[in-house]
């Protein structure tokens, strides 16, 4: 008695069709399909940007460096 029979489902579908009509339901399904396509396209765009690696930066250890400032007071001062 707690489960819905086939007659319950037929009545529910009939009420939905009467309230929304054929045109609104098909428009709604078209909007849902368009949203799914847009979502999938967004996922594919994200994957394309994720696949593109950043350029590798190399460090040249033998490159000349700028002269470091020299300290003139080498010793410690006693107080």
From Swiss-Prot:
Keywords: Cell inner membrane, Cell membrane, Membrane, Protein transport, Translocation, Transmembrane, Transmembrane helix, Transport. It comes from the Bacteria. The chain crosses the membrane at residues 1-21. Residues 43-60 have a biased composition (Basic and acidic residues). One of its GO terms (cellular component) is TAT protein transport complex. HAMAP family: TatA_E (MF_00236). Part of the twin-arginine translocation (Tat) system that transports large folded proteins containing a characteristic twin-arginine motif in their signal peptide across membranes. TatA could form the protein-conducting channel of the Tat system. Belongs to the TatA/E family. This is Sec-independent protein translocase protein TatA. It comes from Rhodopseudomonas palustris (strain BisB5). The lineage of its organism: Bacteria, Pseudomonadati, Pseudomonadota, Alphaproteobacteria, Hyphomicrobiales.
